[in-house]
Amino acid sequence: MTPQEFIAKWRASELKERSASQSHFNDLCRLLNLPDPITADPKGDWFAFEKGASKTSGGEGWADVWRKDCFAWEYKGKRKDLTAAFSQLQQYAIALENPPLLIVSDMDRIRI
């Protein structure tokens, strides 16, 4: 996948977060010529979609993508508040072993 193909595909997409986030991340992996989570770690021990985590505020949640010792990633729908998404991800960070990068995206923007 070329950068132009990636941009064109995701600029045109109107899918909701739930139906698009894993496809978006897999396309990003293809763009960067990196293995996606399922290919890299079929058991999900160190690289996974929907990694469960206890929130520091109580309750349970899921990071949309997590790679041990690398990052946690939270997706939101297009044009959603990424500051709120970052706050949500911060609540999972301890349970996710404090990854050095917290990333949020609405599939148009990526913030690290």
Regions found by a protein language model. Give the residues of each.
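A short, conserved, highly charged catalytic patch centered on acidic carboxylates
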Residues: 1-101, 109-111
